[in-house]
Amino acid sequence: MLTLLFTIVVTLQDPPPQGGAPATPAAPVAAEPMPLAAVDDKAAKAAVDTFNKAAKGKRSMNERMKAVEELAQGANKAFVKPLVGVAENDESLVVRKRAVVLLSLQPAPEAPRALRALLKSKKVEAAPAVLAEVVSGIARSGYDTTMWPDIEPLFASDYAAERVGLQEAILALVTKHKEHKAAKLLLDNLDEPIPADEHDPSNPPAEYWKARWYAWKAWREKVKEALFALTGQRFSTAAEAKAWLDKNKRK
């Protein structure tokens, strides 16, 4: 009954793709930011002092954005702390996201360490758009496989529409870095999501399946691309992909 109701709702609003129907065109990919030139410590300290003084007054969003841009015109470890502060606390998601981008262009090891910490920040967790930028920043600057346990749970924790960008950022990271630990996540999200047993009392409600279906529709082609990056193969179903992976396990 649950499957029937969900199918009816989805069919009426936005029919699932059939057979060989063309995929929904992907959204334009934002251009990667250019690396920043190094700033000497004296100039960096002066920039941070100016930023901190300006932060004490009441400012518009445009003024706050300008301050962030002026702070991080270059790269220096001194910029990491104030950028983290903006990423967590600014009133504007636009300003917070820009701070994360600029943070990702700061020197290692300070910047990658700060980005990893932001993954666990409650303030960032409450803003999926900012969290998506954090994942993209990690992919850009210093991702290593030890970070995967912090990133993986973010994908399926919620399939609400506002988290689609985060899920796409995770898939982009997997594709870019060929993260083989993500194989199970990809298999779990390759097929059209429907309940395995609609009569199971522990089965999530219809609203869950509806949200998950629309999320899946948005990024399903990216799941296929991530699997291709890992295997060099194209798969139509999770069973097909699993059979190949089981047969070709990494040594």
How should these model regions be labeled?
Residues 1-14:
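Sec-dependent N-terminal signal peptides
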Residues 11-36, 235:
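Cleaved targeting-peptide boundary
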Residues 29-41, 62-76, 85-88, 94-108, ...:
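Structural detector for internal amphipathic alpha-helices that build alpha-solenoid repeat scaffolds
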Residues 40-54, 76-89, 97, 108-122, ...:
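Amphipathic alpha-helical scaffolding segments comprising HEAT/armadillo-like alpha-solenoid repeats
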Residues 56-61:
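Charged, low-complexity interaction regions
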Residues 154-159, 165-169:
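Short, structured interface segments that constitute the first stable element of a domain
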Residues 225-251:
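Terminal, low-structured helical/coil segments at or just beyond the last alpha-helical repeat
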